[in-house]
């Protein structure tokens, strides 16, 4: 069984905010890429209408996710001026410490019970 944690955060992007949203997300991506070797996946996706975005992430474990949270958590206030979270799902074995950090975001947790990771 893997210790990896995967996320799917869904956002509604504010009207006339797409350009600013994309620019700000680029800053978050750069911060993540430069400082987090244990963040395995950090991908933003936007629908064709430009009003919904998804952030997909995979971390080696809870500690890697906490490191990510420390690196970009201070950026959330600005992110939320461009978009609001409409769904937050976390898949995998999350530590109690990580849950305390994520609970204010209204996260729904899913524990791994079967499958393979390669």
Residue ranges of each PLM-predicted region?
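Short S/T/G/P-rich N-terminal loop/turn motif that feeds into the first structured element of a domain
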Residues: 1-53, 60-71, 81-118
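A short, acidic, amphipathic alpha-helical segment used as a generic capping/interface helix at domain edges
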Residues: 73-77
């Amino acid at each position: 069984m893997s210790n990896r944690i995967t996320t799917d955060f869904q956002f509604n992007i504010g009207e006339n905010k797409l350009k600013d949203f994309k620019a700000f997300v680029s800053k978050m991506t750069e911060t993540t890429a430069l400082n987090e070797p244990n963040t395995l996946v950090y991908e933003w996706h936007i629908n064709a209408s430009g009003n919904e975005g998804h952030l997909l992430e995979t971390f080696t474990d809870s500690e890697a996710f906490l490191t990510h949270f420390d690196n970009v958590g201070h950026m959330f206030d600005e992110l939320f001026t461009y978009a609001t979270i409409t769904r937050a799902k976390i898949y995998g074995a999350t530590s109690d410490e990580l849950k305390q950090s994520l609970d204010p975001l209204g996260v729904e947790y899913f524990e791994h019970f079967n499958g393979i990771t390669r």
